[in-house]
Amino acid sequence: MKTNYIFVTGGVVSSLGKGIAVASLAAILEARGLKVTIMKLDPYINVDPGTISPIQHGEVFVTEDGAETDLDLGHYERFIRTKMSRRNNFTTGRIYFDVLHKERRGDYLGATIQVIPHITNTIKQRIIECGEGHDVVLVEIGGTVGDIESLPFLEAIRQMAGEVGRDHTLYMHLTLVPYIKAAGEVKTKPTQHSVKELLSIGIQPDVLICRSDRAVPSNERAKIALFCNVSEKAVISLKDVDSIYKIPALLKSQYLDDYICERFSLKCPKANLSEWEQVIYQQANPVGEVTVGIVGKYIDLPDAYKSVIEALHHAGLKNRIAVNICLIHSQDVETRSVKILQDLDAILIPGGFGYRGVEGKIMTAQYAREKQIPYLGICLGMQVAIVEFARHVAGMPEANSTEFVSDCKYPVVALITEWYEENNNRKLSNLGGTMRLGSQPCKLTYGSLAYQIYGKTIIMERHRHRYEVNNMLLKQIEAAGLRVAGLSEDYKLVEMIEYPAHPWFIASQFHPEFNSTPRDGHPLFTGFIKAASEYQKKQLNKM
């Protein structure tokens, strides 16, 4: 079967939820038995988002093959079963980087390199390669129509219709239809102007998704269809909802999937959304409620911890517990003391880089350990737990990570190239100083709490870090009571730790949040929320 392409653009304003809309449509098509994948094309010049500040761009989502990608790929994986890879996300910077590399290598045989055809051809080639073996590829174009940065992508997708055939391409445009309170009606003019802008580029949209805070009336949809030259049944109202997991059903109720399958001549059964109905039911009918504190330094933009926040809510679904999330700046712990943590039912320290706020995280880990509060540390959250335990239990008062103090007396966390043999000779490794990225196997210690949670010995989880627990100091830490619960496949690197003297104190070097989905959850987060509920009950019994 020939691959079909759905190109999704945005208009009027940004942040309308284009990624969620794309993922929701993909979920419906997948529920019809189609093999679906999604791409995100980002117009910024960075080669990838790996070095962009989380405060500016949100989290970096890591794929199984180790690509550092846009957070929208996290939405894609949470809505469909297909796993994303480095092929599913690229930027303007990556395209130019690759084209210039080829030019320097002489691949273009001295030709003058231009946006058309060299840049656009590279974009089209990547789209076609990603679509191989799939029935439908949804391609989300980042940014807003009219932005200068998006023009090469828009030109490339315009050309795609001529290359793969108009019968196998569909252009979908998502716009804002604002409600004007003073007039008491929605206004369609911004959508008309946005479509006009798209037409000037040579793209006639086939489907319009109208975002609004309320349902767009049928007469207004008919007006949009008339002025924008779109079929009336292809003008879809997408109102605000209290849960993003209601959007697949909302789109299906307007027969968007039927329209697309008819357009592509796809013969497939009706979508079965029973799994999503179950998710919505669990979300609407909790039997309990807990408060989890996320202690980090990027809390000014919650999207910096998007996958962690979503994973906590997924765990709440599995436990039928509503999860209230309290974002706490780690520097506030330093300046205002750990008292700001006292009303929490559980504490999570997520990943991060840099020294700012790290002492507040160490104080938080100590508070959770001493007060017997359920604790989940992720990446840096595991490293600060190691540092805290070494300082206050294992007899290493000056313990630290070399990321923060390069010449510390007890470098319990360090680059592998900074580990020292007992005779003080540097132990070198070709792994040192490199970022560990992507999915890697971890061997769990039989009988550990981690083993009980996962229910198996070998697990696969995704990594994004440079620093590791220093094996040269590990024996002293273990002798003080901390348990290594998981090791890398070669038994050389610590992947998980736990504290047996605590009811639920676990930390991982990997990022389990990237494998959590609303339909399946994740065992580590599910166990964490269950422990939070049990802790809450114990505290109530003490009153």
UniProtKB/Swiss-Prot annotation:
Gene Ontology CC annotations of this record: cytosol
Record-listed UTP binding positions: 14, 187-192, 223
Annotated keywords: ATP-binding, Glutamine amidotransferase, Ligase, Magnesium, Metal-binding, Nucleotide-binding, Pyrimidine biosynthesis
Domain Glutamine amidotransferase type-1: 291-538
Pathway as given in its UniProt record: Pyrimidine metabolism; CTP biosynthesis via de novo pathway; CTP from UDP: step 2/2
Record GO biological process: 'de novo' CTP biosynthetic process; pyrimidine nucleobase biosynthetic process
Family indicated by similarity: Belongs to the CTP synthase family.
Subunit annotation: Homotetramer.
Protein name in the entry: CTP synthase
Organism: Baumannia cicadellinicola subsp. Homalodisca coagulata
